[in-house]
């Protein structure tokens, strides 16, 4: 379906809220791992049986921080989506899969407030879908990729897979 006029112009902005949410989410998770102590995350990976837990903890933190910032500013989206997707898939399979789909497991409501159980893999799938959407559709206006493509004259529009 061909979009014309205003709808076509607005479509280009679709990636911006996805980039903001996904980029911020990865940065927040990476930052939390740093603030809580990388050794704590290393211990979690070791308990899950992840090989080279210390190296993998730091690699994950670096990917979440750097990759999250890259997604946030729309830089090198197809490239940074690969390690970020790998992190999501590993988390979904090794941590969240046994708890089912739902990301919210309300166990009970007490005087102290609601008590939740472990999250399922729903959020991992949503992040994967958002990354795939940005990769396929391009990072949109107000992105490093768009600026780079326009400045270098590489692509005729955005920098998504659809533009190659």
Enumerate the predicted regions with their spans:
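Membrane-interface interhelical connector segments
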Residues: 35-55
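Extended, low-polarity transmembrane helix blocks
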Residues: 1-36, 54-62, 66-69, 73-164
């Amino acid at each position: 379906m061909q979009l014309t006029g205003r709808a076509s112009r607005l479509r280009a902005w679709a990636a911006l809220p996805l980039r903001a949410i996904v980029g911020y989410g990865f940065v927040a998770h990476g930052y939390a791992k740093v603030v809580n102590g990388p050794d704590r995350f290393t211990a979690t990976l070791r308990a899950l049986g992840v090989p080279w837990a210390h190296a993998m903890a730091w690699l994950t933190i670096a990917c979440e921080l750097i990759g999250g910032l890259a997604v946030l500013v729309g830089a090198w989206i197809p490239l940074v989506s690969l390690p970020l997707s790998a992190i999501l898939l590993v988390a979904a399979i090794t941590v969240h899969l046994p708890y089912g789909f739902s990301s919210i497991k309300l166990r009970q409501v007490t005087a102290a407030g609601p008590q939740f159980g472990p999250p399922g893999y729903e959020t991992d799938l949503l992040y994967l879908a958002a990354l795939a959407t940005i990769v396929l559709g391009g990072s949109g206006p107000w992105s490093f990729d768009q600026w780079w493509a326009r400045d270098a004259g590489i692509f005729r529009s955005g920098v998504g897979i659809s533009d190659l």
